[in-house]
Amino acid sequence: MFALCDKLRNAQAAGTLYSDKVMRMDRRICPFLRTLRGWALVVGLLAGCASEHAAKPASAPLHRDAAALAVIAEADLKRGDCRGASENYARAATAGDVQVARQATQVAMACEHLPAAWQAAQRWRSLAPNDREANALYAAIALKLYRTAEARAAINDFWRAEEQLDAAAGTAPGTPQSSPVPDAAAAPPVLTARAQQRATRSMGELTALLLEESDAPAVLTAMSGALEPTANSPDTFTLLGELALAAYDGQRAQGYAQRALQLDPQDLAALRVLARAYVMRGDAPQAVATARRAQARDATRGGFELAEVLASLDRSEEAHQQLEQLRAGGAPQAEVDRRLALLACNSGDMKEARQRFTELLASGEGNDAAQLYLADIAARDGDPDGAIAAYRRLYDSSVALSARSRAAALLLDRSARTEALALLDDYAADHPEEELDLTLAKARLLADHGEADAGLALLSTALERHPQHPSIEYDRAVILEQAGRVHESVEALERMVNERPDDPTVLNALGYTLADHTLELPHAEGLIRRALAVTPDNPAAVDSLGWVQFRQGDARGAAGTLAHAYSLGHDPEIAAHWGEALWVSGQQAEARRVWAAALARDPDSKPLKATIKRLIPDAH
């Protein structure tokens, strides 16, 4: 059941309804993120920090206690005590200079010690209020703690620093890009355009960092508050539109895209945002018409966008035809084949998907993701040995954590516990920078295979290393519910709501948990509606609303809400809820149709199969 809550927490990773631009943001390493890429980098960074400080004299004499604490922190880090290093560096920062505060912030962020990171970042920003990097990391930590007002202030300061850089170059973002004086020298307009491009790139990199550390709704709240009042370029409005799509707010995305198109009616990125906003809002005719406008603007890129929109609208045959037309028109064959493989996979046609992914690999155009799909297809087709063998080939690839986690799940299914956990432990030994993600993955795996207590024990240990970490606290609440400790789960989520009252993930999780156990239904509905106010088109939150309506006895009304939720995100658990609402309201034939279609997409969904078995005991 909490798969939905996990999906809400990771909304920016769901790529069906927003453009590739935001998906690429998550993979980009912006300049002020390069030193945060994990434990191994921190060790190297600290090893060289003495020489760095020698080369760059401090702006003020370093307090003796700060220097001593910094030395202790380095020793902590080198012997693997990330918490000790974070806390000692944070203490050093309180009396240290800018360099110490910067180092303290980076170490604590890499160690996922949020209280220490927040303490150090506040100090750094107070010492260097106009430093772009200080403001960027301050905003990232603030958003991770759901301090959106503080994040917005730092983003404003970041943007002012951008303006100062451009002013120093003789121009500023927003300056008209053509001279009102005929025959004026060409240099200023060129410089202005270059400055605008640099500012856009810089804000894209900041957005990438913020999305890496927080959820899209929080990033949208902070970024829009900082950028929207003075926005005057298509790029800025398109960026905000992308964020609105990632935050599942179709109406805001539509508005931003339309404002971008008022400035440049031919802007392809804005047309893509607008088309997907219409998809999210359920306006299929406008979505297709807008995608065709994009196709008229750029036959290949716009043509791919049209295929994507058709696929999102469940018009798979038309999407298939569109992709074949692109092939005939000279579009890159490998890209056409990749999209056809994904289309087949998402439509439940595993035979075609397997064939196309295999052909991609044979032609040399495949990648690790294609191999991962083939392994997933083998697992889905009931061939665990073949799937494990395929996952094994990816154990040291770019998708290693996914491959190892899925192989571990299959091994746990056959009670090979030691071998399963070794897959993750071995990877952790070689990749300590991913320790937290690995711990969370292991705890979820154990809980999903009947070992909730073991998963909770892992999370308790993780909280000692990463105190007050919201991801650990959230997963702990999830697993408490799985273990049947519902009241403890509710208490944990209530504490998180008190700390993060506008976080839609936590609001929805608490509301859904109460509804699923028929507890405090009016309160549950209120919580879910608060989540929907922030992320109105999120399928998980819309599903929760439908489920609380069902629990309140309105099966027919719930069916309509759940149908909308399923149109937003084809999650099998939403289909289970939708079918049950239809069944109870007397529409058994329609319920069977919904379940059959969902099973074709996700034949191994435990919630879906459990619902069908409960309502149709003799179903096979």
Q: PLM ranges: what are they?
A:
Residues 4, 21, 31-34:
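Generic detector of N-terminal low-structure segments
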Residues 58-78, 86-620:
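Alpha-solenoid helical repeat scaffolds
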Residues 26-39:
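Bacterial N-terminal signal peptides that target proteins for export
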Residues 46-48:
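C-terminal motif of bacterial Sec signal peptides marking the signal peptidase cleavage site
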Residues 3-18:
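N-terminal polybasic/positive-inside topogenic patches
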Residues 18-24:
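Short, Lys/Arg-enriched N-terminal segments with co-localized hydrophobic residues
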Residues 50-52:
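Bacterial signal peptide processing site
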